[in-house]
Amino acid sequence: MRFFVFLFLIVGCWCDVQILIDETGRYNITVNNQVWLRSSRMAIYADDQWYSTENTSLPLANITTAEGKDSTLGSWNETRLTYLLIRKQKTTPIVARIRQWSTVSALTFYLETGDLELTTNVTLHVDDVRTVFPSFLIEKMDQNDRRGYFTVAGQFGGQDDKHAGLWNASSRVVRLGYHGGPVVLFNLTEQGEGDTLILSPLSHFMDTSLTQTTRASQSILEYGVAGSMTSVPANYMQAFIVYYSEQGVNKGAREWGQTLQRVYNRTNEYRLNDLSLNYLGYYIDNGGYYCHNTLPGTNYEDTMIEIAEQIDIPYHYMEISAWFYYKGVRGGVSNWTARPDVFPHDIPYLHRRLGNLPFIIHNRYWAYDAVYQDKYAWILDPEGGTSLPASNDSFWLDLLTEARDWGVILYQQDWLSLQSIWFRPILTEINLGERWLTSMGQAADQVGLNIHYIMAYPRHFLKALEIPRVTQARGSDDYAINLMNHTEPQWNMGITSMIIDALGIAPNKDVLWSTSVQPDSSYGENASEPLPDRAILMATLSTGPVGVGDRINYTNLERIMRCCRQDGLILKPDRAITTINALVADWADNEGVPQGELYSTQTTM
């Protein structure tokens, strides 16, 4: 059997990474001459059936090589595997490409699905995939193989279902494909300080997933278009990256993220200059004292005026949260404008009344009965009770222009997860989710607003690589959870911060209390913050917003001012606080049971 061998020469690295491709199209990735990943099948689902390399339905026609230069990542050479898809009396070449780079320690995988649309009447589950390339066996190679993994998954940047374990066939690495995110694979014998691979999508982040299947008693990691998509357009191309670092989990994650930022030419300008990331703010969201809890006998207009006059900290903006707009079917937003019982004189009046104090403002998923459908192109989902603008740039431009005129500097897009899974067309129509977020981001850029993602799946903040106006994303659950249940460590965002920060986005811990007990809140009579210093510390070192949500006369000024200058400028580190490599390794080595919390960050003086 013949092998095609390609060798990475990684500058300053004592080890090498190889990709070996045999004459059947199978490939192995080795680290230090040890096999780390072996390929499985390549497959396409169309016409309600699978075409696969496992049988003769997707035969390999030829293997060729090519080389070239990318303006961003430099020189490359690649192997091209051409398969023949025979359907509807037509033969379509399907090209799978494996590219290696001369100056970047990564392998990139591309699948070109051919010049015919891939249609089907019977769709697969959303957590499955309908195009498969690449795919890797999840296996322990021998008795000396001690590798672990972790991954982020679920809401809040993957905080909800982040998990870790040993890399073997019995591990459930991907639990729900659509909810999942990057997979970090590392050497446990080095306590996470050495060889590391990061596996993640490289394109079409809203439409593609990693999934895990079992075939012939083998556990397999597969990447491709989400199984619920009804069709894949002609000439579609998906991309995937396997990034290698010899410098451990944290450094490897940062290098991976920096590489993706280079691919998408993401600028750091908006994050660096975001007022809400640089200065203290006052928050009234779920965990803030005044969330759904105005001063007695008043509305939010009066309450916010009183807060502005009485809260004695150098805050530079205030938050307007989910209590200000009209809600409709299934709790979605029906009309994103101020209710008169909340703001009798409307938001522009309040902005002027507070001396033109900037606002950050909340939004959620769109209700089925949203009032905009008569004026703009709008898609309805009666089954999910939700709706969405049909990637109509004029809608987002009108909406965010109005917000800017209210005094808004940051738009918070919350409930991203439910807008994605409750709105069926995003799961069935390829590119719709991409267009939704792109249109929002382009409009924000036109009017000069930044965006904060909340309740995001990993796919959302990966998509934000293409949307530089997304400057921040929540990496933890709502702070109210912490106030009501001290056994739920809402503050422990060291894993999600690692991934979010690597992508050029500031992780957000959510609002905080600076005093432990603040009576008569909406969170129950036993609500409290057991460790206010910890809450302030984690918010500060996250590099995200530091948002105070205290009751009037309950702010501990001494505590708050430890995190900032007298003018409210936050004294933040150079990178977000993250879990140290050794604790990540212990987490995996103990099959996903956390062994404590220990964090690190750094600052250049």
Segments (PLM) and residue ranges:
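Glycan-recognition surfaces
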Residues: 369-406, 438-556, 577-593, 602
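Aromatic-lined carbohydrate-binding/catalytic grooves of carbohydrate-active enzymes
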Residues: 275-430
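Mature catalytic domains of secreted/periplasmic carbohydrate-active enzymes
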Residues: 215-221, 331, 418-427, 434, ...
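Carbohydrate-recognition beta-sandwich/jelly-roll modules
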Residues: 16-318, 335-341
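Non-catalytic C-terminal accessory modules of carbohydrate-active enzymes
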Residues: 56, 60-70, 553-605
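Glycine-rich, histidine-containing beta strand-loop boundary motifs that form or position
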Residues: 111, 124-128, 284, 322, ...
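Alpha-helix-loop-beta-strand connector modules within alpha/beta enzyme cores
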Residues: 345-355, 431-451
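Cleavable N-terminal signal peptides of Sec/SRP-targeted secreted and luminal proteins
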Residues: 1-15
